[in-house]
Amino acid sequence: MDLRDRPRRLRTDGVRPLVAETSLSTTDLVAPVFVDATTDERVAIESMPGQERVPIEESVARVEEIAEAGVEAIIVFGIPESKDRSGTRAWANDGVVQRAVRRISAETDAYVITDVCLCEYTDHGHCGVLEEGADSDPRLTVDNDATLDSLARIAASHAEAGADMIAPSGMIDGMVGRIRSALDREGYENLPIMSYAAKSESAFYGPFRDAADGAPAFGDRRHYQMDPANAREARREIALDAEEGADVLMVKPALPYLDIVAELRREYDHPVAAYNVSGEYAMLHAAADRGWLSLPEVAHESLLSIKRAGADLIITYFAEDLARRL
């Protein structure tokens, strides 16, 4: 038998790490932080084991815990003390994210990314200003152009509070361009935008909506988030956000959309982000709780696959645990 090519030669323990094509680092990771203006104590998120909402007063302590694990970047989500039809608390000077970011920026060295959307702030749970009659007519949805002004106001308020990067997530047409213009006008031309460029209307978001109290009161988000079936549409969405000035391009969710991540990496020189979402996190925990999987191993392999597909940064609820093992 003449086997000149034997790939197993490079699988021994000594050489395996030398020829590994992909590796994870703590600098690849972004940890989500949920700040809740409705509570004075930490509240565990039942559907996301190990995750919790923290009051504004605990936000710095929470970020310090993440930093001690080795993760330097966070993304902040807010749960406001009150909601209304237009989501006005989202851009309030004394809003939950604004107050938390001021504290975190002043007292830690964390790199602070802020999520820019309206779903946590509207009493209807949708990601923008509603068209007239949308709460009773399923043919109606979010008013795209009216929502753009709100997103620009939110972004500017986060910038004023000290955010290091703005991350619009609503899948509203034109959101990146409008936010870029608003930031530039206010003197924040050097503040980068990480766009949720290809965000699908996914069943994997369930636990997050519990965590952030942002589930729609009626209907769904099919009219503005992408159809999971569409890859060509993802390319179009990504191209539009790149043209409008996005500095980082994100795919959400991550694991079911690695084909989109890989194509984005091939086609663009922008940094690529992927969001390892709550459902991806929760299902691994559920399987591990049944004894079917080893959680540390499958978490590492899942994030490694996202990195291998082409992601430069990964937003993940596994950030702290993985960082400690790395």
What are these regions (language model features)?
Residues 1-57:
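An N-cap/entry alpha-helix motif that binds or orients negatively charged groups
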